[in-house]
């Protein structure tokens, strides 16, 4: 039987209850078989093109970098059906679940984007859907909760722990351990137990593949850097995957610094965590001195995650990718700037990557550089959050 690598360097693995090992083995084999099946690939690509709207545009910003010599392109995953990059890999996994004969889908969601993507894929493909969501996130992402319900999903609020994404992940895994014969756990990021990090990367890698083709067609060369926000890391690994071998291209991941990287209110485990076991994998993790998982924090629900995907941990360890961070305030500023200068309202998650690109442009205004930001989602879901913050600050 063919097998995928379970580890990226020292990170990854499969730290799960014994009861889930057969389910994960079945999933790995089904994925390998599907990848080798031209019919599966063709059905996946057809859905991406005709239902989701791929390829997405690569947009050159006209006004944002005025006064600098930076050319900044945006990879427009915000234009994808469902409003974010999440739709790509959800369609892939839902097709895989059907191929495996599963009738139900279990998912977890933070910002609600993965939940919405899962709900739409289940509606399309005739699968039952239940989504676990931290009770706090249910409150701060009410439009997405209603979208999920409209599409027939059952949304289950999780009140344990910090009532956020990590708690939803735990509950979803618990559910799956009792229902895996009929249900597929559709994990929402490039993290968790093997083979999920690999499956999610492969079902997101068209982001980077399209970007490479588009930038070569437009500019005749590769970008100096590709930049993406990192929570669990699926949009970033989707952008990075096709550029890893291109050593001239810097890969820059941006973690949430929250209220400040020197406070205890951030979500930057890559730079400020310790290696531990969480969510079925070995990875950098925000922990207290007793090894307990610390609460992460970010203004954006989708980055509010105390760990990170194992391939990002490995790319960081070997120095192939670099990871920086951006505060809530910087992300909010970038969110407003893009709206005002280009007429595009980005997700707060994506605004972190955008803020970093703007920092790069403005710190070296005379430097000619070609940058691509993965604009991983649109900001409709965040307008109430941003409105409340700006109102509190007296800006509006």
Swiss-Prot record:
Q: Which PANTHER family does this chain map to?
A: TRYPTOPHAN SYNTHASE, TRYPTOPHAN SYNTHASE-RELATED
Modification sites for N6-(pyridoxal phosphate)lysine = 86
Q: Which family does it belong to?
A: Belongs to the TrpB family.
What species is given as this protein's source?
Vibrio parahaemolyticus serotype O3:K6 (strain RIMD 2210633)
Q: What is the lineage of its organism?
A: Bacteria, Pseudomonadati, Pseudomonadota, Gammaproteobacteria, Vibrionales
Task: State the name under which the record lists this protein.
Answer: Tryptophan synthase beta chain 1
The record's keywords, sorted A to Z, are: Amino-acid biosynthesis, Aromatic amino acid biosynthesis, Lyase, Pyridoxal phosphate, Tryptophan biosynthesis
Q: What cofactor(s) does the depicted protein rely on?
A: pyridoxal 5'-phosphate
Q: Which domain of life is it from?
A: Bacteria
Q: Please give the pathway this protein is involved in.
A: Amino-acid biosynthesis; L-tryptophan biosynthesis; L-tryptophan from chorismate: step 5/5
Query: What would be the name of the gene that encodes this protein?
Result: trpB1
SUPFAM superfamilies, per the entry: Tryptophan synthase beta subunit-like PLP-dependent enzymes
